């Protein structure tokens, strides 16, 4: 959220109106934002490297190796590795996997697969987090549409981010676009603050109504990463992954 003036006055008014106002620990300084931005550049460079090399016939473990090697080559550390026991340096989620898939030598990409590669980087102490969908070769029109609409949902969310509006405004833009295209948004998993830690407050939902949730203020840094489902929003945790 870009800088602006009049923070104190707006805070007082919003608190009086009963809205959720972010604490000072959520708001980053300009120096911290610059550090997060530099981390984000490394993160995107790693995703670009994956984009140049991903193809049918490789394992998701190969993607993990690319991410780990490239991140370290650029001076970063893969944030997922060892985080709450996660055993790999990247999350790879194929087709009906919603998120947080664990790379494996046994999982081989096939023509027509769609895969989300979720890269997170620590660079000079700052965290960044971004994912990208890839279509392996040619796929079905239904899968192509799902990937396209998911990207559009992110773009609609970004357009709705403005100082002194609400996270619910962003969520409404994301959810509305998904529904207009016949899709649903996962409720139980959302975005999060990021920058000084991997996962920070606030929790970022993509299904809450306009005018609700936390006030967006200058200096906040958070992810917009809706999980868009073809079908219902229901999910379950795979015991093997």
Regions found by a protein language model. Give the residues of each.
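Single conserved hydrophobic/aromatic residue that forms the stacking wall/gate
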Residues: 1-7, 11
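Extended, compositionally biased flexible segments
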Residues: 15-20, 25-129
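Residue-level recognition of short, solvent-exposed, well-ordered loop/turn junctions
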Residues: 55, 110, 148, 162, ...
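Short, basic/aromatic beta-hairpin or loop at an interaction surface
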Residues: 82-96, 189-204
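Acidic/histidine-enriched ion/cofactor-binding microenvironments in catalytic or ligand-binding pockets
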Residues: 93-126, 201-241
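Short, compositionally biased
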Residues: 128-144, 235-241
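Acidic/glycine-rich phosphate/pyrophosphate-binding loops and surrounding catalytic core
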Residues: 141-169, 177-181, 186
